[in-house]
Amino acid sequence: MLLTTLLLSIGELRSSNSTARHHPALQHKKAKRLFKRQGIVVPIVVDEHHRIIDGHLRFQIAQDLGIDALQAIVVSKATPAEVIELELALNRLAQDSNWDEARLKHK
């Protein structure tokens, strides 16, 4: 698997029809508010055909906000199975973590 980072125009990006995650309206609203204030600071991940592997919500909000381009990590020379594994793993990682309540009190 080969990884490169590019700035891709919104028009070059392709939304995947196979995304396994659903983003509720409240999550979309919160993320949009954050991205308006801070910008989209995490690159999306795409395959060599610029189909989104990870970052559908960021892509949707970029469209909503009229953002012209996004930083993207392009995954090439990956098998279809590797792409599916990457998509599922990236979407699952945060779900499997817990907050450290003691540390949150100091933030």
Model-found features: residue ranges?
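Short, charged/polar connector segments at secondary-structure boundaries
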Residues: 1-107
